[in-house]
C-alpha cells in the first residue's frame, strides 16, 4: 500500500472520505490505485484539517471525490488522452446540451485523461470551495458567509479515453455529416486569418491602430465567433437528441446521490428502454 500520505514534489497528500457508504465508488477507485483513505466523518473534521494544514504547509488533505482519481495525487507520469483538442471542442457543446439545470448548482464540463476502464463521466467538487461552504454552515459571518451564499460548483469530468465517449463522438460526426467538415474548415481558415492579423499588428499599441485596422480586427473576431456559434448550435441540437450522453451523465449523478425525483424516474425509464434494445 502507498500509505495514508503520498509524497509528490515534497508535498504530503492525505486522501480522506467523509461518508464511506455514499462515496463508495470514489473510495474503491482510490483503493484500486493502492491508496489508503482516512475516514473523516466528524462535525469538526473540516476545522481540524484546516488547522492542521495551517501548521504543516507541505501537507494537505484531499477528499476522494474532489477530482478524478488520476489527479488527486499528481504524478510525474500522466495518462494521455485519446481525444484531440479539436475533438474536445466538438464534444463540449454536445455534453453541455444535456447538462443538469439547478439554480443552486453550477456545473462545468472538463475533459480528463482517465483509464478506459473507469467511468465515462465522473462528477467532482473542488476541495477548497466545498470545504469553505461546509465551514460556512457551521460558523457563519465574514468570508464564511460569503462562500455560503455562493452556488455549489461541480465539474462534470468526461473520460477522454472511454470507449463510450469515443462512440458518442463518432455518432455526432455521423449525424452532422459532410457539413461538419465544411464549417470546421471555414473556422480554421478564419482563425488562421485572425492569427496573421494579430502577428502583423502585435507590435502596435491600441492607440496606434488605425480605424481600418480596428474595424478589420472586429470583423475577423466576429467571423470566428459566428462560425463557431453556428457549429455549436448544431452540435447542441445533435447532443440533445443523444440519449447516451444523458445516460452517462445521469449515471455520474446517481453515483453522487444527486439524481432524484423526476430525473431519477426518467433515468430508470431510459435505462429500461436501452436494455430492451
Q: Residue locations for each model-derived region?
A:
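Long, intrinsically disordered, charge-dense linkers/tails
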Residues: 1-277
Amino acid at each position: 500500500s502507498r500509505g495514508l500520505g503520498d509524497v509528490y514534489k515534497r508535498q504530503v497528500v492525505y486522501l480522506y472520505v467523509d461518508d464511506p457508504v455514499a462515496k463508495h465508488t470514489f473510495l474503491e477507485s482510490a483503493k484500486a490505485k493502492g491508496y489508503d483513505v482516512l475516514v473523516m466523518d466528524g462535525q469538526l473534521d473540516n476545522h481540524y484539517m484546516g488547522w492542521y494544514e495551517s501548521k504543516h504547509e507541505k501537507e494537505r488533505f484531499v477528499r476522494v471525490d474532489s477530482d478524478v482519481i488520476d489527479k488527486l495525487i499528481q504524478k510525474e507520469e500522466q495518462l494521455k488522452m485519446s481525444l484531440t483538442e479539436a475533438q474536445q471542442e466538438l464534444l463540449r457543446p454536445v455534453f453541455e446540451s444535456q447538462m443538469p439545470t439547478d439554480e443552486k448548482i453550477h456545473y462545468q464540463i472538463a475533459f480528463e485523461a482517465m483509464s478506459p476502464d473507469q467511468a465515462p463521466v465522473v462528477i467532482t467538487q473542488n476541495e477548497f470551495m466545498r470545504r469553505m461552504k461546509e465551514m460556512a454552515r457551521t460558523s457563519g459571518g465574514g468570508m464564511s458567509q460569503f462562500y455560503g451564499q455562493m452556488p455549489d460548483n461541480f465539474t462534470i469530468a468526461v473520460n477522454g479515453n472511454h470507449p463510450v465517449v469515443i462512440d458518442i463522438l463518432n455518432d455526432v460526426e455521423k449525424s452532422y455529416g459532410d457539413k461538419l467538415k465544411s464549417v470546421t474548415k471555414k473556422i480554421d481558415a478564419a482563425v488562421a486569418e485572425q492569427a496573421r492579423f494579430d502577428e502583423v499588428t502585435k507590435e502596435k499599441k491600441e492607440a496606434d491602430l488605425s480605424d481600418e485596422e480596428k474595424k478589420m480586427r472586429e470583423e475577423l473576431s466576429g467571423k470566428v465567433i459566428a462560425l463557431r456559434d453556428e457549429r455549436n448550435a448544431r452540435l447542441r441540437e445533435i447532443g440533445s437528441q443523444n440519449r447516451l450522453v444523458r445516460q452517462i451523465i445521469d449515471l455520474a449523478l446517481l453515483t453522487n446521490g444527486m439524481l432524484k425525483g423526476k430525473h431519477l424516474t426518467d433515468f430508470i425509464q431510459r435505462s429500461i428502454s436501452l436494455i430492451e434494445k
